[in-house]
Structure formats: C-alpha cells, structure tokens
Amino acid sequence: MTLKFSVERLVDSEKESEEADVEEQNNLKKLEEDEEDDELCEKSGKNEPLSQTLSYFDVLLPHVQMACSNPFISGIGASGSGDQNLNTGAGGSVWQHPWLELLQSTTAAQFGDVTAGLFLQPLRKNKRIRTAFSASQLIQLEKAFEGNHYVVGNERKQLAAKLSLTETQVKVWFQNRRTKHKRVRLEGSDPNAPMSNDEDDEDDKKSVS
C-alpha cells in the first residue's frame, strides 16, 4: 500500500515537473517572439519616412500655387500698397498664426507678396458696371415711363430689344426712375423731369446698397 502510494506520488510529481518545464518553455518562446516583434517595430519605425501624413500646409500649398498663377492676381504684389497692408493690423503684424508665417516664408521667394494678399484681402462685391445710355435711348425710356411706370414681361423684352439693351438694364433703369419720381414728388419738384446718366448712376448705387 505504501509502495503503491509512493509510485503514484512519484509519477504525479514527474508529470507536474514535465508540465512545468513545458509551460516554462512556452513562456520563454513567447518572450522571445515578443522581443523579436519589438525589434521589428523599432526597425520599421526608424526606416519609415516621416511624411506619411499630410499636414494642413501640404494640402493648402497646391491651391495657393494655383491661385498665384492666376493672371488676374498677378498685379497684387506689384501695386506697392500690398507691402504696407501686410505690416499693419493689431500687434503690428497680421501673421499671427505659425502656419501662416510658415506659408509666407516658404512661398515668398517664388510668389512674392501675392500669396499673402490672397489671405489678407477682404471679400468684395463686384462693382456693377455703369450703363451709359445714349440720348436716343433715354428719350425712348422716358416715353415708356410716361406711359407705364412698371414695364414687365413681353413689354420689357420688346423695349430692351428695340433699344439694344438687356432686360436687366431696362429693369434697373425703371427701378431708378421710379425712385427718382418718388423722391422729387416728395421734394415738390417736377416728377416728370428726365433722368440723366449721372442721376441714374446715383440711384443705381442706392438700389444696390
């Protein structure tokens, strides 16, 4: 009985020892694999180029270069006033952001101050081109206005074609003429006085504003 118990205990201890050895070998193997993975990661990290991701500057620069090649912007840097505008503003400099400073310094050699002007110039509404009506056109428009203060639809289309004008030009002229008619009537002047090109230009500015 005692011998049997001793043999079983010896066998069990040998199994436990073998299992411990196997587990230790597995742990050692896993540790070696982890070390190899760490070395590979370090090597790949050293060899990997830094410019894998695009910064905001990288994305913005091509658009700036394309805009600078626009012939309509080429006169900005040569006007002479651009340099003065670039150095004004709060704190003595308008280039308060680091990326703007980087953009300016990088592109200044190639594009001058044109690049800076792209960021600093405020958005402006396109100025409406003044229509210079001829004397005969003004006479015909005044006659049409005497007959009807509101010319719309086919009547406006026919009048524009007759005077070699666009419908928009006729529409704006009638708007300005009605404005003058109301104004002179309030002032006690002659509301039927014809409107000159200068008066048309002034009323046009008021209607646009």
Swiss-Prot record:
One Pfam family it belongs to: Homeodomain
CDD domains assigned to the protein according to its UniProt record, in alphabetical order: homeodomain
Record feature DNA-binding region, as residue ranges? 126-185
Give the residue ranges for region: Disordered: 1-46, 181-209
Tissue specificity field: In the anterior pharynx, expressed in the I3 interneuron, the NSM and M3 motor neuron pairs, the three m2 muscle cells and the three e2 epithelial cells (at protein level).
| InterPro entries for this protein | EMX-VAX-Noto_Homeobox_TFs, HD, HD_metazoa, Homeobox_CS, Homeodomain-like_sf, HTH_motif
- Please provide the record's keywords in A-Z order: DNA-binding, Homeobox, Nucleus
Identify the PROSITE patterns for this entry: HOMEOBOX_1, HOMEOBOX_2
GO biological process terms, semicolon-separated: brain development; central nervous system development; neuron differentiation; regulation of transcription by RNA polymerase II
- Where is the protein found, in the record's own terms? Nucleus
Report, from the record, the phenotype seen after gene disruption. Mutants lacking the homeobox domain are viable and fertile but proliferate slightly more slowly than wild-type due to retarded larval development and reduced brood size. About 20% appear starved as they are shorter, thinner and paler at all stages with severely affected adults bearing only a few eggs. M3 neuron activity is decreased.
Q: Which GO terms describe its molecular function?
A: DNA-binding transcription factor activity, RNA polymerase II-specific; RNA polymerase II cis-regulatory region sequence-specific DNA binding
Under Gene3D superfamilies, the record lists:
Homeodomain-like
Regions of compositional bias (Acidic residues) in chain numbering: 15-24
GO cellular component assignments: nucleus
User: In what ranges is there compositional bias, type Basic and acidic residues?
Assistant: 1-14
What is the additional note? Can substitute for ems in D.melanogaster ems mutants, partially rescuing the mutant phenotype.
Q: What does this protein do?
A: Required for activity of the M3 pharyngeal motor neuron.
Q: Give the similarity note.
A: Belongs to the EMX homeobox family.
Q: Give the protein name, as stated in the record.
A: Homeobox protein ceh-2
UniProt source species: Caenorhabditis elegans
